Amino acid sequence: MASSYPMLRYGSSGQEVRRLQQALNRAGYSLEVDGGFGEKTRAALMDYQRRAGMTPDGVAGSKTWASLG
């Protein structure tokens, strides 16, 4: 999965961000799936990363995508 998705960060937008938001929602978050990587997506991502034992940097890179799998 990780190789199929680009690195995403605050300010990113598009279909890949929608996929990230959907994955976070499957992990228990309640994000609007709007394709915009705003503050709510960043906060949810950082919380997810923290809970998963990763450095909570708010960037969806290969480790985050692999964990969200």
For each feature predicted by the language model, list its residue ranges.
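Short hydrophobic/aromatic patches at helix-to-coil boundaries
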Residues: K63-G69
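Conserved hydrophobic/aromatic packing and binding residues within compact polymer-binding modules
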Residues: L45
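Acidic, Ser/Thr/Pro/Gly-enriched interdomain connector segments
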Residues: M1-D34
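Sec/Tat-exported extracytoplasmic proteins
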Residues: L24-G28, V33, Q49-P56, L68
